[in-house]
Amino acid sequence: MNCKILFRKELNDSECELSLLLVGDSDMKEINRLRRGKDKTTDVLSFPLEFDFSPLQKILPKNTSSDQKMFPPVALGEIVISIDTLQKQAKEIGHSEKDEFYRLLVHGFLHLLGYDHERGDKEEHIMKLKEDECLEILQGL
């Protein structure tokens, strides 16, 4: 079992890819300033390539065994993680850097899929449940 199973509905069984950029706090601060107008560092940023707010399953091609090789992977976007902040947060929370990396990666991935904790309490709750579900699987790896 892996995270792909958790997101089967969202990904419509399609092959997808994303870019992952690991940076220091100074670069993260600059990216955050340029892309979001916030002059501070942060732990993770996500930049989806699909700006249509339709559900992803309407956009992604259905992947069946016969046409698995027919479609190239769908590029979901980019996740940027600050290694400096990751290390600080792991120490503050009291878990490993690997666990913090997984937490930030899952958080960023959920944003690429359209989940957004900043849209209100209900959305935050839904995103937190998905995050916890995926992290439980990843911790077994």
From Swiss-Prot:
Keyword Zinc: yes
Obligatory cofactor(s): Zn(2+)
Cofactor binding annotation: Binds 1 zinc ion.
Gene Ontology MF: a single term: RNA endonuclease activity
Pfam families in the cross-refs: YbeY (PF02130)
Location(s), subcellular: Cytoplasm
Source taxon at top rank: Bacteria
Function: Single strand-specific metallo-endoribonuclease involved in late-stage 70S ribosome quality control and in maturation of the 3' terminus of the 16S rRNA.
Protein's name in the database: Endoribonuclease YbeY
Gene, per the UniProt record: ybeY
